[in-house]
């Protein structure tokens, strides 16, 4: 499960974006399912976004539209943990298509 922490931001050059982090905060040491956002440098490998809310993304990274039947598995006991899944599902998950804007833009890291 994640929360939005208003004092946490993603920074890129002069740009600054509010972002969602794990409930346990940011730490160097982490293990799967601990609700910690790992500290480090990572490469963005894929982008998911709400096409109805974000009109255009200009990047060389693969971009995918978030659809109503998309979820993200957050069940550490599942083989699908931390992966995109199709809803409905038996696994614990986060719905990606939501009324709020927490998942309007998702950056998948390596």
Predicted regions and their residues:
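Cell wall/extracellular polymer interaction/catalysis modules
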Residues: 1-110
């Amino acid at each position: 499960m994640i929360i939005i922490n208003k004092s946490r931001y993603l920074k890129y050059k002069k740009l600054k974006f509010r972002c969602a982090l794990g409930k346990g905060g940011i730490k160097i040491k982490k293990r799967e399912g601990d609700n910690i956002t790992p500290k480090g440098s990572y490469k963005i490998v894929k982008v998911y976004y709400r096409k109805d809310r974000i009109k255009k993304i200009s990047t060389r990274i693969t971009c995918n539209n978030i659809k109503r039947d998309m979820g993200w598995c957050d069940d550490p006991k599942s083989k699908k943990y931390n992966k995109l899944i199709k809803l409905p599902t038996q696994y614990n998950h986060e719905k990606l298509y939501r009324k709020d804007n927490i998942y309007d833009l998702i950056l998948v890291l390596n």
